[in-house]
Design a protein with these regions (language model features):
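Short coil/turn segments that connect the beta-strands within blades of beta-propeller domains
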Residues: 14-16, 56-58, 98-99, 141-142
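Structural motif
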Residues: 23-30, 67-73, 108-113, 152-159
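Blade-level signature of beta-propeller repeat domains, shared across WD40, Kelch, NHL, RCC1
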Residues: 108, 128-163
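C-terminal hydrophobic structural anchor segments
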Residues: 83-121
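Short, composition-biased motifs enriched in small/polar/acidic residues
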Residues: 160-194
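Extracytoplasmic beta-rich repeat domains
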Residues: 1-13, 21-23, 40-54, 65-66, ...
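Aromatic (tryptophan-biased) beta-strands that constitute blades/sheets of beta-rich domains
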Residues: 1, 30, 34-43, 81-87, ...
Length: 194
């Protein structure tokens, strides 16, 4: 795009490329040798930094500029149409695992939500960091790592999450992690040297 900031990585979907920036249209394009063809183009998803995630035929991302955006949105990748919009989550970065969205808001709230095109359904939320958070949560070794712009890094021990009545369970299925998410809970923070 011709925007002043083109920081969001291109997203691959079904052999096509989704390009977006915070001030211009998002566009799904098909590469044809040395030419391209636009599949759809609209303003339904305009991402500043974090690229978001594709699950099946749906894309989940944070729409808007990082300083003032507050919308997480699901769009249909075949049509570009909006499936749902969730306001009041300050410009977020998103990762996904086991059919769940792991969303870190700009102000340090971590959300766990269903990855469903039908609706936004929050499963858990906890304040995990202070300061400005722009980097996506990272999953590794049964933990979620989150970081703020000051360089503070936290390791969230998902297997030790305190929940009533059931704890979070994490299982390995071959090389794949499977999570059993609670309806609510408090994340245990373990500081790591950054």
């Amino acid at each position: 795009t011709s925007a002043s900031v083109n920081a969001a990585d291109p997203v691959l979907y079904d052999g096509k490329i989704f390009l977006t920036s915070n001030t211009r249209d998002g566009e799904l394009i098909e590469l044809r040798g040395t030419s391209t063809r636009s599949i759809w183009k609209n303003r339904n998803m305009r991402i500043h930094f974090n690229a978001g995630v594709v699950i099946g035929d749906y894309f989940y991302g944070a729409d808007g500029r990082v300083e003032r955006g507050n919308t997480v949105r699901c769009i249909n990748m075949k049509t570009g149409e909006t499936e749902w919009t969730k306001s009041s989550i300050p410009c977020a970065s998103i990762t996904a695992a086991d059919g769940k969205l792991i969303i870190l808001s700009r102000n340090g709230d971590l959300y766990i939500a269903e990855a469903s095109p039908a609706r936004f359904k929050q499963l858990a939320r906890s304040k995990v960091l202070s300061g400005t958070c722009w980097t996506p949560p990272v999953l590794a070794n049964r933990s979620v790592y989150v970081r703020n712009s000051r360089g503070t890094l936290y390791k969230l021990q998902m297997s030790e999450m305190v929940v009533e009545p059931q704890p979070l369970t994490v299982n390995f299925a071959g090389s794949r992690l499977e999570f059993s998410w609670p309806a609510k809970g408090n994340f245990i923070l373990e500081s790591t040297d950054a």
